[in-house]
């Protein structure tokens, strides 16, 4: 008569910690396997590789509209396509995110244009 999986699980569930330890050792010897976790080392290497990866998306944040707000409003409208009122609100209610997820070159170009108009800008 064969033992079902359910019966086997019930039996193993009733074992003490010492008996379970002996069972694991017996499995290791009989089948030539190890119960030591191997995934832990691999996970650490993956995290290190992700940390080295270069950032590809940047946010352009307007910190201050400066003294020449009209010029900054014009540039904000040009870069974002916002209407006059929305662009004015963005310049007056700083800090404001002007662009999210821009690539490195676009973010740098936007920053240069806004700074040329008199704004203080940050790229994150």
UniProtKB/Swiss-Prot annotation:
NCBIfam families: L12
Subunit note: Homodimer. Part of the ribosomal stalk of the 50S ribosomal subunit. Forms a multimeric L10(L12)X complex, where L10 forms an elongated spine to which 2 to 4 L12 dimers bind in a sequential fashion. Binds GTP-bound translation factors.
HAMAP family: Ribosomal_bL12
Domain of life: Bacteria
One Gene Ontology term from the biological process aspect of the record: translation
The protein's name in its UniProt record: Large ribosomal subunit protein bL12
Similarity comment: family membership: Belongs to the bacterial ribosomal protein bL12 family.
Species of provenance: Wolinella succinogenes (strain ATCC 29543 / DSM 1740 / CCUG 13145 / JCM 31913 / LMG 7466 / NCTC 11488 / FDC 602W) (Vibrio succinogenes)
Record's keyword terms, sorted: Ribonucleoprotein, Ribosomal protein
GO terms, molecular function: mRNA binding; structural constituent of ribosome
Function: Forms part of the ribosomal stalk which helps the ribosome interact with GTP-bound translation factors. Is thus essential for accurate translation.
GO cellular component terms given for this protein: cytosolic large ribosomal subunit
SUPFAM superfamilies in alphabetical order: ClpS-like (SSF54736), Ribosomal protein L7/12, oligomerisation (N-terminal) domain (SSF48300)
PANTHER family to which the protein is assigned, alphabetical: 39S RIBOSOMAL PROTEIN L12, LARGE RIBOSOMAL SUBUNIT PROTEIN BL12M
Record-linked InterPro entries: Ribosomal_bL12, Ribosomal_bL12_C, Ribosomal_bL12_C/ClpS-like, Ribosomal_bL12_oligo, Ribosomal_bL12_oligo_N_sf
